[in-house]
Amino acid sequence: MLKEPPKNSREKTKNLLLTLQDKICSGLENVDGKGKFTEESWLRDEGGGGRSRVLKNGSIFEQAGVNFSEVQGKELPQSIISQRPEAKGHEWFATGTSMVLHPKNPYIPTVHLNYRYFEAGPVWWFGGGADLTPFYPYLSDVRNFHNEHKKACEKVDQDLHKVFKPWCDEYFFLKHRNESRGIGGIFYDYQDGSGNIYRGNNQKGEASKASQNIGRSNLNWDDLFSLAENCGQAFLPSYLPIIEKRASQAYSSKEREFQLYRRGRYVEFNLVWDRGTIFGLQTNGRTESILMSLPPLARWEYGYKARKNSREEFLTSIFTKPQDWLNDKELEKFCIENNIFD
């Protein structure tokens, strides 16, 4: 049986996620130098509300959205009950901060972050993660993003990243395209300190295998709160150095067209596969905030084929497939030889 969360669990997680929203927005405004976030507060008829912040047409970001929400309800959607049937019949509470950034320059990756907390009767859990979607990737940028999140996980438990990295690869996968959305990062869900770390549906996947090797989780509520805090704080150091390196990199209409084409994959994932989008729409969430993740511009092209050994081909042949980004020496050698390391 789960241990009860602290009496102030809801207020504590709410404050953590509000602070995360503030820090991220401040950091992004500083690096953009031109754009400013506009805030819109909203209330939900069934209980709760949030604040949506969007930056448009900055010097770096074509569109950046950082949302906070805190919502309550009486009827849980089927998508939650199917995962945690013991929550059925209980009033529920959910709070989260989510972010999607769509930069102008195709050499700066799109990035997504989400950290959340949920309670319903005897059930509670933390979830979250961050993932990077480059269009013209460099291995050094990919490594920095992964390494910062690995360090954040290991502050709480040395084993978590071994599960969260492959879980991210598994979750952000477009089954209808048979490719990853990007180069991954970390992803976790339904973390309540009981049972195995992995709580996904693919019991034959790499995340499940890693979790089985590790065994049962012994993390408590405070550990999982610290995990969300550490991982949230890891975002800016994982991403801002990429902006600083790539913001002045020149690009042509060809790279811009490819960026818009690949953004189409982002749209496809978010509307077809993403559980957060589905949960928000099923619970009468604020549609504008839920769909904030979509890029302002995207395009589709029938039967697109990249030129052999081009940067565009390297994206689909290497950087949309799960890799051991931090340790694979053959991958490092290939990237150096093809000028896509740094």
From Swiss-Prot:
| Catalytic residue list | 112 (proton donor)
**Binding annotation for a divalent metal cation:** 102, 112, 146, 176
The UniProt family comment states: Belongs to the aerobic coproporphyrinogen-III oxidase family.
What is the protein name stated in its UniProt record? Oxygen-dependent coproporphyrinogen-III oxidase
Recorded GO molecular functions are: coproporphyrinogen oxidase activity; metal ion binding; protein homodimerization activity
Please name the NCBIfam families in this protein's record.
PRK05330.1
Q: Which gene encodes it?
A: hemF
Any idea of its EC number? 1.3.3.3
List where in the cell it is found: Cytoplasm
Binding of substrate occurs at: 98, 114-116
Role of this protein: Involved in the heme and chlorophyll biosynthesis. Catalyzes the aerobic oxidative decarboxylation of propionate groups of rings A and B of coproporphyrinogen-III to yield the vinyl groups in protoporphyrinogen-IX.
Cofactor(s) needed for function: a divalent metal cation
**Family matches, as PROSITE patterns:** COPROGEN_OXIDASE
Taxonomy, superkingdom: Bacteria
Gene Ontology terms: biological process:
chlorophyll biosynthetic process; protoporphyrinogen IX biosynthetic process
Describe the protein's quaternary organization and the partners it interacts with. Homodimer.
Return the broad EC class. oxidoreductase
